[in-house]
Amino acid sequence: MALTVAKLLARKADVLGLALLTRESTAESEISTDEVVSPGLVLAGFTERFTSSRSQVLGETELAYLRSLSPEASREAVQRFLSFDIPVVFITKGLEPPAGMVETADERGIPIVSTRLKTGEFYGAIKAFLEAQFAPSTFLHGSLADVYGVGLLFMGRSGIGKSECVLDLVERGHRLVADDQVHVTRRSGGILIGRGNSVLGFHMERRAS
């Protein structure tokens, strides 16, 4: 499932201090992976093994390198970098993009997005958000409780008392997470996170005795 840059901006612009520098239509570009990288040696001309399908981040080091070049060499490096089909380029610390980058990106339909965050801080924040977006997930029929900080999922055929078991735990001071339909997401490291759906919320369905 792809995520457009427009949706990213709508959801995280305030939190991550994001601003679109290119024309609005470039924000329809789609991010299809949670991988975020810096272009590295591509700026110096080595394009072999460049993973252009990933979101790219330009920090102070990359921009300082481009500024160290002659205007012509800097322009060539930018054009070479943007000749690939890149989903989005982030520029950290609110730094100014190199001369000609925004114009070239507009021509190529590549969004350039500025963030006020420092590079390391931004990497962590955007990576966490994208991992959550692209994490594999499924819906399971069952009841989920939080028991001393650990999720306990009760599964089985209808009518065997899953909800009743969780209710018994709730009466003992534990917490109901979801009943009937549990949305389970697998994060990095094999961690499973369960939550309820927006319709049922923290309500429970229980048969009358």
Model-assigned labels for residue ranges:
Residues 129-149:
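P-loop NTPase nucleotide-binding/switch module
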